[in-house]
């Protein structure tokens, strides 16, 4: 599709829609995972994964080696000869991920890749993507409406509103600083939260220590884990306004990441 204005840059190289050869070459470097799996029902797991390489004219030996490697990577070795109609949603998405990796792309684009899955299956797919990133170093771009997906797997995030970039940055910093765009997205029901804190470890002990040391009344509005290892915890809390500055000083001394929050009446500021 053509766009009205701007440029498309991949690895610093501008890609022109009019330059079909450039677009064709870059397609080999981008793998795509869709929400609805997009598997060919008449082909089995092995054949679905092999399809891109066959289309590009690779030898049978090259295809067999790569496909078996990827089937092992997505943990579907026992489903090699199965057809899509006999697979669960999670298994279908694993096949789709393997197929997207056949051409050894530099970028894996996941468009709502977990939105059609139940929470447990979604978590297993996110873990698989994280493992693939760790093992191969591939860049993974995730398009999602579920903030939990972004929070669990992404190191950086961007929020789009009406076609414009509303906010971006490191995931942990965006969730802590809670810009207006994120708060609109989250649609918080409470307007009392005035402090955002990220604990890297022992979150319950550190929070209890702060409450004890400062003699605080703390209302925990929200608590969310960040990252697949669940070690980093983000708290959104309300503390008495007269204690807010003291809390910030205490957290700074402990080298704990924290940020003041504005009231919801300022959400559009």
Locate predicted features.
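ABC ATPase NBD coupling module
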Residues: 2, 15-31, 55, 60, ...
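Conserved ABC transporter NBD signature motif
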Residues: 6-14
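Conserved ABC ATPase "signature" region
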Residues: 13-14, 50, 54, 61-78
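Short coil-to-helix segment of the ABC ATPase nucleotide-binding domain corresponding to the Q-loop/switch region
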Residues: 43-50
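Conserved signature/switch motifs of ABC ATPase nucleotide-binding domains
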Residues: 82-85, 102-103
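Catalytic Walker B motif of ABC-type/P-loop ATPase nucleotide-binding domains
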Residues: 108-111
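Helix N-cap at the start of a conserved alpha-helix in ABC-type nucleotide-binding domains
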Residues: 119-121
């Amino acid at each position: 599709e053509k766009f009205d204005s701007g440029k498309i840059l991949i690895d610093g190289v501008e890609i022109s829609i009019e330059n079909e050869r450039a677009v064709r070459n870059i397609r080999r470097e981008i793998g795509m995972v869709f929400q609805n799996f997009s598997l060919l029902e008449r082909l089995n797991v092995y054949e679905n994964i092999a399809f891109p390489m066959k289309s590009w004219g690779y030898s049978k030996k090259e295809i067999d080696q790569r496909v078996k490697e990827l089937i092992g990577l997505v943990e579907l070795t026992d489903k090699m000869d199965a057809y899509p109609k006999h697979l669960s949603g999670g298994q279908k998405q694993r096949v789709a991920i393997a197929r997207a990796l056949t051409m050894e792309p530099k970028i894996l684009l996941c468009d709502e890749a977990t939105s059609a899955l139940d929470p447990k299956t979604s978590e297993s797919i996110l873990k698989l993507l994280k493992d693939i990133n760790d093992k191969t170093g591939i860049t993974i771009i995730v398009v999602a409406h579920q903030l939990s997906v972004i929070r669990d797997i992404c190191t950086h995030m961007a929020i789009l509103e009406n076609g414009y970039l509303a906010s971006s940055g490191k995931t942990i910093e965006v969730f802590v600083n809670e810009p207006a765009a994120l708060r609109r997205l989250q649609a918080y029901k409470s307007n009392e939260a005035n402090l955002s804190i990220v604990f890297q470890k022992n979150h319950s002990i550190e929070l209890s220590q702060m409450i004890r040391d400062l003699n605080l009344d703390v209302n925990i509005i929200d608590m969310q884990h960040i990252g697949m290892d669940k070690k980093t915890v983000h708290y959104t809390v309300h503390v008495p306004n007269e204690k807010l500055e003291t809390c910030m000083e205490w957290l700074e001394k402990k080298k704990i990441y924290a940020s003041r929050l504005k009231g919801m009446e300022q959400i559009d500021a």
